[in-house]
């Protein structure tokens, strides 16, 4: 990722962390990162993997798209590229991504926020995908919907695969309360 993308991503993570009243140490610990690594990411100096960004989204209890919304170019590593196409703002929240996987790629994904599902439609190539214990082969034009709050994966054979991924997050209560610690006082925020 280039410097402007890393800076934007870092600011998004830091803003969400502070809004949720989490310390740098607490978020780093919860996400399984070294505090120094999270600090570098927030400052735009780190180079987080897609899995690291997903873990941070899960720990912040926000959709992945909230962290990468301002990133216009594809994010990628190890033969996988992902680009946010659009974000919904309704309840339940729906985000749409374009994803490309290189030949002979296995992309293992950690569980997302509880209640999340993914619906993937294969555009080109061949793909084996779904929950780890219920993988499905997809033909071009076919869609597979599965629980994404459990370990799941995407696996290609000797060809590239391109797909659309629709992530639907669990419906949220209408009036949720979050607390942000400011000068040892709690401020009630309605979302």
Give residue ranges: language-model regions.
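Short basic helix-loop element that most often maps to the first helix and adjoining turn
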Residues: 11-28
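Recognition helix of helix-turn-helix/homeodomain-like DNA-binding domains
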Residues: 32-48
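DNA major-groove recognition helix of helix-turn-helix/homeodomain DNA-binding modules
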Residues: 51-66
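A short glycine-rich, His/Asp/Glu-containing loop-to-beta-strand
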Residues: 76-111, 166-167
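Histidine-centered metal-chelating micro-motifs
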Residues: 106-108, 144, 149-153
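Glycine- and acidic-residue-biased ligand/ion/polar-headgroup-sensing regions
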Residues: 115-131
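Short acidic-glycine-tyrosine-enriched beta hairpin
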Residues: 132-149
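Ligand-binding loop in jelly-roll beta-barrel domains
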Residues: 148-173
């Amino acid at each position: 990722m280039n410097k402007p993308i890393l800076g934007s991503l870092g600011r998004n993570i830091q803003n969400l962390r502070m809004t949720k009243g989490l310390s740098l140490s607490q978020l780093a610990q919860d996400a399984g990162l070294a505090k120094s690594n999270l600090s570098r990411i927030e400052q735009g100096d780190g180079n987080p993997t897609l899995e690291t960004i997903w873990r941070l989204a899960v720990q912040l209890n926000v959709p992945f798209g909230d962290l990468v919304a301002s990133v216009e170019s594809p994010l990628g590593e190890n033969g996988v590229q992902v680009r946010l196409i659009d974000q919904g703002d309704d309840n339940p929240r729906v985000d749409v991504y374009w994803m490309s996987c290189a030949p002979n790629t296995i992309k293992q994904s950690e569980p997302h926020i509880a209640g999340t599902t993914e619906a993937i439609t294969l555009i080109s190539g061949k793909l084996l995908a779904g929950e780890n214990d219920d993988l499905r082969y997809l033909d071009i034009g076919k869609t597979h919907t599965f629980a994404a709050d459990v370990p799941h994966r995407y696996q290609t054979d000797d060809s590239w695969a391109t797909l659309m991924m629709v992530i639907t997050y669990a419906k949220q209560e209408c009036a949720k309360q979050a607390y942000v610690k400011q000068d040892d006082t709690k401020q009630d925020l309605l979302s």
